[in-house]
């Protein structure tokens, strides 16, 4: 869902 995509997006944006 959108929640999973959200955490994924933030994860990539953080560069982790």
From Swiss-Prot:
A GO BP entry is: chitin catabolic process
Q: Which reaction does it catalyse?
A: Random endo-hydrolysis of N-acetyl-beta-D-glucosaminide (1->4)-beta-linkages in chitin and chitodextrins
What does this chain do? Answer: Defense against chitin-containing fungal pathogens.
Q: Which cysteines are joined by disulfide bonds?
A: none
Which family does the record claim for this protein?
Belongs to the glycosyl hydrolase 19 family. Chitinase class I subfamily.
Designated name of the protein: Endochitinase 1
Which keywords fit this entry according to its UniProt record?
Answer: Carbohydrate metabolism, Chitin degradation, Glycosidase, Hydrolase, Plant defense, Polysaccharide degradation
* InterPro entries linked to this entry: Lysozyme-like_dom_sf
EC number annotated for this UniProt entry: 3.2.1.14
Please give one Gene Ontology molecular function term for this protein.
endochitinase activity
């Amino acid at each position: 869902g959108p929640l999973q995509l959200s955490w994924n997006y933030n994860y990539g944006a953080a560069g982790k």
